[in-house]
Amino acid sequence: LISKGRAELVVGRGSAVEAFPLFGFDLKDYDALFAEKLDLLLKVRDEEFVTWSGKFRPAMNNQPVYPRALQKKLPVWLGVGGTPASFVRAGTLGLPLMVAVIGGQTASFRPLVDLYREAGRRAGFSPDQLKVGLHSPGYVAETNEQAIADYYPGYAELWTKLGRERGWPPVTQSKFNALIAPEGVLVVGSPEHVAEKLARHSEALGGVDRFTFQMDNAGLSHQQLLRSIELIGEKLIPLIKKNA
């Protein structure tokens, strides 16, 4: 309602296992919890009066859920990482797919995206119903050099800290350079550079309908983020449309 119908949801199982004990859940129920909660979410989205029962929360009997979304059908994307079953689930349900890629090369996800499309086809959904999105850390500045200078320090600090907690090696300049290379997943650079990289990502995955940036994970200032958003709207999007 606040966004006047522009809001959409991306839902996924999540990678932060620390939340489970906070809510009194057992990590062994990781997948079952998500399957049940996704089922309830779609039920609430599609029906004003909900009758539903499950294992992990009280049942609902003809209960109304308000406020309703402004859209006739609130878009719900299924966010996935690298688990094949998650791609199959999205295809079987006919939900649009949002692939979260934070490391490696985008092309390595092509077999999983193909798995999604095949599962959707087998479930009776048409190709235009099976949308694919790509979510990745990214940042746009006036030049490649400026983007890297702005982005690298905060990115390295954050991911090195997370890595210490999870047993990952620290971020180095050479590893960062590999991630911003033509085949790497990070989308950091000038509008022209980013437009070219997004085109390569789309080709690598057999076509991408949407790309979402995660820009607030590198200690960027409010002004830097605002300018990046301006560049995306004023320069990057026109370039993408021109080359489409």
Q: What positions do the PLM features span?
A:
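Active-site-adjacent structural elements that line small-molecule/cofactor binding pockets in enzymes
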Residues: L1-A244
